[in-house]
A protein has these predicted regions:
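N-terminal small-residue-enriched
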Residues: 1-306
């Protein structure tokens, strides 16, 4: 691509994805692996992980609604943050005052362990060199040490904002243009925990969530989302994974989830967020697993499985 703005460049991109869902009556498990090079994907390991989770979900029990301490695995955290980010860290949403950031930029609203960026240049993700308007990509700090720092912009939203505002290279694919600029490369800094087991020990008494689905935005200005857990939800007792749980309905304010974070894993995972329903645009969230002091369960669903 060559633009009148002086940018000239080219990009060749690939992505490889292995998704595994192991399910039978009353049991299910899920795992995935995403990379830009097929050599970095191990379908056999993905399948084994899904099967192991499924084996542990049989005979799932119910859980009373309430506020629980929780560990969210990277698949769960990736999906939760991607939904939150599209409304929160969009420059257009900020201009239209429908973003959680509205009136809060520069304030510490999250735990100081939480730092989030939009970074399409990170080779651990699915790198992109420029956006759909031909603007070069860049790393955009969104949250630093719990402080809300900024949003992403495309050419129209930056022009509307005026002043010295410039596009950050976040124009989305044509099918998504109505939403304005979007952060397609969410990256959360890892923490100090060496394993998920260490996070489970920190939580001590709560729940573990592998994956989410059917997410919906309830109140974007407050960052409230609702959805269901699936394919591997467990009770945490005495710092260990205990009995499996049925699928749970949750309604959370994401800022509450991120406000008190006992820990995050050092290792991050590329959680696949590619759309397979219309125009496909491969992207993902580079995230650790996280321990949170608040995850609000508001109801129960059916058991795992088919």
């Amino acid at each position: 691509v060559a633009t009148s703005g002086g940018f000239s460049g080219e990009q060749t991109s690939t992505d490889a994805v292995a998704l595994a869902l192991a399910a039978t009556d009353g049991a299910s498990g899920y795992a995935e692996q995403t990379a830009w090079a097929v050599r970095d994907v191990d379908p056999g390991a993905v399948a084994r992980e899904a099967v192991e989770i499924a084996r542990r979900t049989a005979n799932a029990g119910e859980l009373a609604p309430g506020s629980y301490r929780a560990v969210l695995g990277p698949y769960a955290l990736g999906e939760l943050l991607q939904y939150f980010a599209f409304d929160t860290f969009s420059g257009l949403a900020l201009l239209e005052e429908r973003s959680y950031l509205s009136g809060k930029l520069g304030e510490r609203r999250f735990d100081e362990k939480v730092s989030i960026a939009d970074d399409a240049l990170d080779p651990r993700g699915l790198p992109k060199r420029f956006d759909f308007e031909g603007v070069p990509k860049q790393r955009v700090p969104l949250v630093e040490d719990g402080v809300l720092r900024g949003a992403v912009w495309d050419l129209p939203s930056a022009a509307r904002a005026g002043g010295s505002r410039q596009s950050t290279g976040n124009a989305p694919p044509p099918a998504e243009r109505r939403w304005g600029p979007l952060p397609f490369a969410i990256s959360v800094a890892g923490g100090e925990a060496e394993s998920v087991d260490e996070l489970v020990e920190l939580v001590d008494d709560g729940i573990y969530v592998t994956r989410l689905h059917y997410l919906g935005i309830v109140e974007p200005r407050q960052g409230i989302l609702t959805g269901m857990t699936r394919d591997g939800t467990f009770r945490i007792r005495n710092g260990k994974l205990a009995e499996p749980l049925v699928n749970l309905r949750f309604t959370v304010a994401v800022p509450d989830v991120l406000a008190d974070v006992p820990g995050l894993t050092r290792e991050t995972t590329l959680a696949n967020e590619a759309a397979f329903y219309d125009e496909r645009y491969a992207y993902g969230a580079l995230v650790p697993a996280i321990a949170t002091a608040r995850f609000d369960v508001t109801g129960i669903g059916g058991p795992p499985g088919i």
